[in-house]
Amino acid sequence: GPGSSLYGTNAFFAVINVITRLGRNFRGVETSAGAGSFETYKGRVSYGEKFQSGLEMVFSGSYYGSDGDDHLFFKEFDKPENNNGIASGLDEDRFENIFAGLLYRDLSFQVNYHKREKDVPTAPYDTVFNKLFSTDDERGWADLKYERIIGDQFNLMARFNYNFYHYSDDYFPNEYHGTVKTSDDVDSQWLQGEVQLTKTLLEAHKCTF
């Protein structure tokens, strides 16, 4: 994609170009829904608009939930003390995502929040099989960007964003026979900023600082 002009075409430095839909790309409210096996449901509601003032806004919220397979068999745990290798009711998955964006002339602001809760039936990290191992991931960010074309050959872009990530899990360590679960919690927050100046050279080449 276009990012290869900055990072090269080497497959080890792959660049994914995500182009967010603008308010003008919507026709009011959009909705979608779906259902599947294992009590699986998902849905999305989106709204976008461009006003006469030039302000554009976008909002989108989505949800996914699944009870998963109630009886998953793992031959590696096929012993009587491990419920004969069957993990019962440990495949639940839930996530929700919220996105909002504003655009006015050369200035844009976007926020995003994502959360996922997942039960893991495979007894990872030497935990007790057929006991609850659940994970909780949260990720969010807010991004403010200013982008302007200067003259015929220069493009200025400046942005600043705030990010956070949270992870937690609950589990029973292996060879533990109590009723109190062990928990892990990880929190991270960071700020980022960048300024880019791009100049077109010889009509078809770009130089970025």
What are these model-derived regions, one by one?
Residues A11-A14, F73-K75, P124, P173:
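Short, glycine/charged-enriched secondary-structure capping and boundary segments
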Residues G101-E117, D136-F209:
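Face-selective signature of the C-terminal outer-membrane beta-barrel domain
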Residues L6, N10-G34, Y41-Y47:
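N-terminal periplasmic accessory domains that precede
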